Amino acid sequence: MNSPQEISILFFFIIFLDYVSAQSPPPPNLYATSDLFKPSLAIITGVFSIVFTLTFVLLVYAKCFHNDLRSETDSDGERIRHDRLWQGLFNRSSRFSGLDKKAIESLPFFRFSALKGLKQGLECSVCLSKFEDVEILRLLPKCRHAFHIGCIDQWLEQHATCPLCRNRVNIEDDLSVLGNSSTSLRILNQSETREEDSRLEIYIEREEGTNDGSSRFSSFRKILKKSLLLEREGNENIDEKKLMHKFNHRIVVSDAVFKNRWSNITSSDLTFLTSEMLNSVSSDRFSSVDRVHRGNLRDKEDMEMKRMLIKHKDSSRRTVSEITTVSREKAVGGSYRGSTASTSQNYAVTATTEERRRRLWLPIARRTAQWFVNREKSNDLNTTRQNLNV
């Protein structure tokens, strides 16, 4: 009886050992720890990727779009800002590719000596050298900035923006701003006879500023060049150089404004017909009339004086007594004073009439210019809205 019990106990012991061996912990997995770190590593990689992408997008935005949007004036409005933004999004590669050589050569150019206005001390913002009368300048019609023809050609081969204001150069849009003036401007310097007979007049408008210029062009070389320039131009007007900026300018092509009739003026020319230009033209116009009138009055007075002197000599010969001589001299003096009073009265009436004409003409010219400008802006807004609706 003992043997079966021993056998059963041994049997249960063997089964227990098998069960315990079956429940023993498995050997440690070498890949368990790596599996635990895989999700956290993926999260870290994703976060770094997102941060890098956002940083890259912000840098591209600041480089490509921020300067262009900042260069727009407040009068252009939100329409131009959105157009420039979309152009930058879809034509990002063309911004840095430059322009074609034929497109660059199609831009208008002129001689610096043909430029009228306060052009003394004006410098090229590409090479930082002063313009000379014999040099040829190329004009960017949209922003109205001019540079040395060699400097701007090399710049436009590598860039598609203006080196001064960073506005994009679009050949078709730029030439449409000038209209017929662009063709005559390109032909201007092909022959000296054309330059003399041409009706084209080019004026410069410069911003007020100090001699220091823009901070973008401040460098040690520019400071040395400025000191040499002051030494060479000691005889020039110092106050005028202090008031005018050396780089910031605008070229106004005014073949229609000053030479043609009002019916032939285009809206693009009237855009730059400011009140200062109207005041200067009107003052020159009426001051010339006054000068002619004053010259005629002086001639009449001289003739009257000569005639009275001749009469005085004849009367002194003919008179017998001093009483008659004195009376005749008084008569002559009275006639002279009467003629002087009449001429001064005529001059006052003429000056009043000319002043009245000037006051009537200036508001009409201003309203006409403003009407053309508003019509051009409304046409541009309608065209933009139609394109957006399509």
Swiss-Prot record:
Pathway: Protein modification; protein ubiquitination. Gene3D superfamilies: Zinc/RING finger domain, C3HC4 (zinc finger). GO terms for biological process: protein ubiquitination. The chain crosses the membrane at residues 41-61. It is a single-pass membrane protein. This is Putative RING-H2 finger protein ATL12. It catalyses: S-ubiquitinyl-[E2 ubiquitin-conjugating enzyme]-L-cysteine + [acceptor protein]-L-lysine = [E2 ubiquitin-conjugating enzyme]-L-cysteine + N(6)-ubiquitinyl-[acceptor protein]-L-lysine. The gene is ATL12. Pfam families: zf-RING_2. Its main location: membrane. Residues 1-22 form the signal peptide. The RING-type zinc finger domain mediates binding to an E2 ubiquitin-conjugating enzyme. It comes from the Eukaryota. A zinc finger (RING-type) spans 124-166. Belongs to the RING-type zinc finger family. ATL subfamily. It comes from Arabidopsis thaliana. It is an enzyme of class 2 (transferase).
